[in-house]
Amino acid sequence: MPTVDDVLEHVGEFGWFQKQAFLLLCLISASLAPIYVGIVFLGFTPDHHCRSPGVAELSQRCGWSPAEELNYTVPGLGSAGEASFLSQCMKYEVDWNQSTLDCVDPLSSLAANRSHLPLSPCEHGWVYDTPGSSIVTEFNLVCGDAWKVDLFQSCVNLGFFLGSLVVGYIADRFGRKLCLLVTTLVTSLSGVLTAVAPDYTSMLLFRLLQGMVSKGSWVSGYTLITEFVGSGYRRTTAILYQVAFTVGLVGLAGVAYAIPDWRWLQLAVSLPTFLFLLYYWFVPESPRWLLSQKRTTQAVRIMEQIAQKNRKVPPADLKMMCLEEDASERRSPSFADLFRTPSLRKHTLILMYLWFSCAVLYQGLIMHVGATGANLYLDFFYSSLVEFPAAFIILVTIDRIGRIYPIAASNLVAGAACLLMIFIPHELHWLNVTLACLGRMGATIVLQMVCLVNAELYPTFIRNLGMMVCSALCDLGGIFTPFMVFRLMEVWQALPLILFGVLGLSAGAVTLLLPETKGVALPETIEEAENLGRRKSKAKENTIYLQVQTGKSPHT
C-alpha cells in the first residue's frame, strides 16, 4: 500500500498547491514576530524625570530652553554613579511656585550647594522625553515599578510554555487545521484586547493568553506545511518557514517607526491577523492526520485536489493510501527514558542547556540593543537583517560540514561578540551594533540547528517527548531573560553581556560533546541512540528535516 510520501511523489512534492499553502502559512510565521519581541517597542523606556508642580510655569516665565529647565530643576544630571537613579526617580523638595525663585540658577537662593537640598521620590508622576507612547509611559513603569516591564515580556514566554503543553494534544485530537483556526482567532482577539486594556493587570492577562495560543498557531502552520510537502523538500521548507519570521521582524521595525503610539501599534499588528481565518477555505486539513484518524475518504479527496492543482495524475492505488508503519511507536514513552542510559542522559542535559542558552542569547541581545541603541528602529532593523544570512549558512553547511561544528562555532562567535562589546566605547556605536548583529546571527543559527539535532539524537519512540522537554527550556529561558537584561543593567550596563558571553562560550564547548549526526540514520532504539558516534551507519541517511513537534520554540 502506498504511503503519504509515495503518493506525494505522484501528485507533486512541491507543486503549485504546496507553494500557495507555503506562502499563506508563512504569513502566520511572520505575524508571530511582534508577539515574540514586540517588547522592544511596546515597552520602550525613554529618558524621564519627576514631574514637579510649578516647574512648567516657571520655565515658561523665565523662557528656559528644555536643556536649561533640566539643568536647573532635575537632580543628579552630569554626576557619576547614581546619577541615573537620582535624575529619573528623585526630585528636589522645593516649592517651585514661590515667587522668590530667580530665573538664573533658581536653587542658589535656597542652598549654596544643590547637593545639600533634600530629595524625595516622585509623587506627581514623570515627564517623558518621547513623541510617542509605550506601556512604560502610560502606566509609569519606571523606578520602583520598572520590573513590571520584565514581567510583561515574561508572561509571553510563560504563555508559550503553558501553551506547548496543550497545543500538541489539540492538534492531534482535533486536527491541525482546527487548531490553527482556533488559536489564530484567540491570538487576534487577545492582541486587540491587549491594545485596549484599561490597566496594567488586565493587559498582563491578555498578553499571557496571547502567548499561550500564538505559539500554537505558529506550530500548527509549521506542522501543516511540513506534512503537505514531500520528504525531499521538508528540511528546506521548514527553514524557510522560519525565515518568514525574520521577514516579520524586519517589517515590525518599519511599522513601529510609522506608529509610535503603543496602542495603535498593537492594533496594527493584531487586526490583520483576523484575515487568517479565511484560511478555512484555502488551506485543507493534513492528509496524514486524517489517515491517523481513519478518515481515509477525506484524505484521498484532499490528495486528489492537490493533484488537480499541481496538474498531476494521482496514482491508481490512491484509495489504498496509508501511514508509514512504525512499530516502535507502540511503546509508551516516559520522562525517565530520556535519562535511561549514560549517552541519553548526556545528550538530554546538553540539549536542555543549548535550548536555554540560545534563547537567553537571542532574546537578550534584542532587548539589550533596544535598551542601549542610539536609534531604536535602525538598530533593530539592522540586527534583524542578519537572520537572512544565518538561514543561508544553515542551508549551505548542514549537509556539507554537519551539525555539531556549526552549532559550536556559532555559540562561540555569539559569546565572543558579547564579551567584546564590553570593551567598545559608547562613541563607537557602529562597532557595538556590528558585534551585536554578529552575536545575534550566531544565536539564530543555533536556534534553528539545535532543533534538527534534537530530533536526530533520540530513538523514535521518545523523539517527540525529547523535543518537547528539551525545547521547553527555550521558553523557560525566555521567562527569565527580561529580568536578566534589565535588572542587571541597573547594576552595570555591560553586566548582561558578561552573562551572555559565558553562556555562549560554555554552550559552544559542551556542544562538542555531542555526536555528529550528518549521514547517520535516525536511531530507532535506545541501543542505537546510545551508540551514536561510535560507529558509522551504512543505513540510508534520513532526509526528513524532523518529525513535527509541538513543543519547539516559536523561532525554530
Swiss-Prot record:
Changing residue 36 to C: Decreased fenoterol uptake. Decreased fenoterol affinity. No change in trospium uptake. No change in terbutaline affinity. One of its GO terms (biological process) is spermidine transport. It is found in: Basolateral cell membrane; Apical cell membrane; Lateral cell membrane; Basal cell membrane. The keyword Cell membrane applies. A motif (Proline-rich sequence) lies at residues 284-288. It catalyses: 1-methylnicotinamide(out) = 1-methylnicotinamide(in); dopamine(out) = dopamine(in); serotonin(out) = serotonin(in); (R)-adrenaline(out) = (R)-adrenaline(in). Phosphorylation of the transporter leads to changes in its substrate affinity, resulting in a regulation of the transport activity. In contrast with rat ortholog, ASP uptake is inhibited by protein kinase A (PKA) and C (PKC) activation. ASP uptake is also endogenously activated by calmodulin, the calmodulin-dependent kinase II and LCK tyrosine kinase. Inhibited by cGMP, most likely through a cGMP-binding protein that interacts with OCT1. Expressed in kidney. Expressed in liver. In liver, mainly expressed in the central vein. Expressed in intestines. Weakly expressed in adrenals and in lacting mammary glands. Keywords: Cell membrane, Glycoprotein, Ion transport, Membrane, Phosphoprotein, Transmembrane, Transmembrane helix, Transport. A large substrate binding region with partially overlapping binding domains for structurally different substrates is formed by several transmembrane helix domains (TMH) including TMH 2, 4, 10 and 11, and it is alternatingly exposed to the extracellular or intracellular side during substrate transport. Amino acids in TMH 1 confer major functional differences between human and mouse orthologs. Involved in the uptake of clinically used drugs including diabete treatment medicine metformin, neurotoxins 1-methyl-4-phenylpyridinium (MPP(+)) and iobenguane and platinum-based drug cisplatin. Metformin competitively inhibits OCT1-mediated thiamine uptake, leading to a decrease in hepatic steatosis. Plays a role in the anticancer activity of cisplatin and may contribute to antitumor specificity. NCBIfam families: 2A0119. This is Solute carrier family 22 member 1. It comes from Mus musculus.
